[in-house]
Amino acid sequence: MTSYAPGMLKGLIDSTPDTAVLINLAEHYAGRQLPATGVDSQVVYDCPRTQVMVRTAVKGTTIGTHFHTVCDEIVVAVGGRGEILVNGQWKPVKAGDVHVCPRGIVHDTRALEEDLQYLSIFTPHLPAGTDINWL
């Protein structure tokens, strides 16, 4: 098997960043200090095309109904339980569930009974100043 060093394959239209990322979610979550309320969020991958955040909605948190005009959001539940507003209806989510929300679609996330751990993947990247339009 051939191995390639970071940055070896150049000449792409957009080749930033020039290194890959591997995240151990168990270690990540174990090392985070959660707020008493709200959402803990850390950007773990950032490029012009995509942004990935590892997040925890703390028990009792409702993010708030909103939509995005520029980017689509993919939410991957990786731990705990919660609910996501999908097409106007609250749906239960647990580890292994994936919610794909195109731009312009109203959605929300809440963690009522326990913390909800999830990934948010935005494509394209969230613009400067954010793309959250609250309702």
Feature-to-residue mapping (PLM):
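A short, N-terminal "cap"/entry segment at the start of jelly-roll beta-barrel domains
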Residues: 1-51, 64, 134-135
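Short, charged/polar surface micro-motifs in flexible loops or helix N-caps
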Residues: 48-50, 58-61, 81, 90, ...
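Short, conserved beta-strand element in jelly-roll/cupin
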Residues: 56-58, 67-84
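Structural motif
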Residues: 81-83, 90, 106, 115
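Short acidic-glycine-tyrosine-enriched beta hairpin
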Residues: 88-103
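Ligand-binding loop in jelly-roll beta-barrel domains
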Residues: 103-129
